[in-house]
Amino acid sequence: MLNLIIATAALTALASSALAQQVAPPETESDAAHHYFHATESAHAAEWGYTGEIGPEHWADLSPDYSVARSGKQQSPIDIKSEFVKPLPKIKFHYQPAPVRMVYNGHTIEEEEEAGSSISVGETRYDLKQFHFHSPSEHTVDGKSFAMEMHLVHKTEGGQVAVVAVLIDEVDASNESFEVLLDRLPNKSTPRTESNRQIDATAVLPKDHAYFAYDGSFTTPPCTEGVKWFVLQKPIGLSKEQIDEFRKTIDGNNRPVQPRHGRAVHRSAQ
């Protein structure tokens, strides 16, 4: 009798364990672990880069976690064709001044943001987590590439990621709004910098907030999909000297454009 009770208890425990595994949500790749949300990347992540055997064409081979870089149908960046106009809601920017805290994480230069800044698109609020830079641009518009691209990375309380992309052209005049960043740019020998000065991310946006919208992915491993992209239509300008300051550290950190696979890209009205 005792043996029967023990056996029954064991079977019950096994059944409970199996049921728990069934009802628990399947483990998915958490965007919280992505370097978009952490200045220091996991020591366990597979090494990746932008050239050679660890470059973009090989990312899917570097780790099973990166397989969507090849198999995914909503990868970013893309070449944006500007023919689809749709009455999209305006992006409302609610950015607050924050201390300059910048880091070079081995792949990009990133400004870490404090809580308090956000955007709203329709009824959805996205909190600003950080912004970082690519040189040259990752997105192209009607085949045109730009000198640089800035990504302002946001996330809702529920985990939905939205990135506002700002294209950057080379122009003759310096952009004074960027001087507070350029004064403290990190580099390979000094990967983290801080300043008593503050940066208001609103100041580095174009005045016109019309945008392109599409569904895509992170542009770096693990290239997780499900990212809302808002690419501002009007570029901002930096002088050659200002762009060169960034390129001392991050020249060539752009993923090539990816197939659209039939995705619609909508353009908001001016």
Region locations from a protein language model:
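Alpha-carbonic anhydrase
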Residues: L2-L4, T8, L19-Q270
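N-terminal signal peptide c-region/cleavage motif recognized by signal peptidases
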Residues: A15-S17
